[in-house]
Swiss-Prot record:
GO terms for molecular function: ATP binding; phosphoribosylaminoimidazolesuccinocarboxamide synthase activity. It catalyses: 5-amino-1-(5-phospho-D-ribosyl)imidazole-4-carboxylate + L-aspartate + ATP = (2S)-2-[5-amino-1-(5-phospho-beta-D-ribosyl)imidazole-4-carboxamido]succinate + ADP + phosphate + 2 H(+). This is Phosphoribosylaminoimidazole-succinocarboxamide synthase. It comes from the Bacteria. It comes from Aquifex aeolicus (strain VF5). It is an enzyme of class 6 (ligase). The keyword Nucleotide-binding applies.
Length: 216
């Protein structure tokens, strides 16, 4: 598998086309960002850690019958994925009140929600990822409206799987975000990554924030 050209470089990853047109290589960067990429800091080993965690989670989800774009881990900082038609929508699942949820609704940080809450955001650094509903998604053509209920269903299933894994390690899964796309086969799948960059994790006994993020 050979890299052909750089397709895109984002805050945390570089995406490369390969000599197989339906496959891409994701290279994770040793860079931490905040405030929509305004603040940046190089952290040695971050890329390999995110690649390792994301690869492991994708493999676990695939074992549970959840489709992802993941094919295999190639190296410390690289993974091979299926090329997908990505939807510019972030799907956030919340188990506890934190981040923008606290600012929007005035709920005390750390409050356990009665049930997992799924929210949708338009993926746009320029617009600071505005919150959207299914009607926005339909009118703005962010994703096929008929797929939104399935995205929510998958997100809740992922939540149950990850919550159990983290709780066994003494970690609370406060919230996390997913991105979705359509594979060459036409199947709906989770794309991008699932790593500490896309989660908020707290120590179960102390409430300490394990991962500092400006997301969701």
């Amino acid at each position: 598998m050979k890299k052909v050209r750089k397709l895109y470089e984002g805050k945390a990853k570089i995406v490369y086309e390969t000599d197989e047109k339906d496959k891409l290589i994701l290279e994770f960067k040793d860079v931490a960002t905040a405030f929509d990429g305004v603040k940046k800091e190089e952290i040695k080993g971050k890329g390999s850690l995110n690649n390792e965690i994301s690869s492991l989670i994708f493999e676990i989800l695939e074992d549970h019958g959840i489709k992802t774009h993941y094919i295999k881990k190639l190296s410390d900082r690289e993974m091979l994925v299926w090329r997908a038609e990505r939807f510019p929508v972030e799907v956030v699942v919340r188990n506890y009140a934190a981040g923008s949820f606290v600012k929007r609704y005035g709920v005390k940080e750390g409050t356990k929600l009665e049930q997992p809450l799924v929210e949708f955001f338009m993926k746009s650094d320029e617009l600071h990822d505005p919150m959207v509903c299914i009607n926005h998604i339909k009118v703005l053509k962010l994703a096929p409206a008929e797929l939104v209920p399935e995205m929510e269903k998958i997100a809740l299933k992922v939540n149950e799987i990850l919550k159990k894994i983290f709780e066994e390690k003494g970690i609370l899964l406060v919230d996390f975000k997913l991105e979705f796309g359509r594979l060459p086969s036409g199947e709906l799948a989770i794309v991008d990554e699932i790593s500490p960059d896309s989660m908020r994790l707290w120590d179960k006994s102390t409430g300490e924030n394990w991962i500092k993020t400006d997301s969701v």
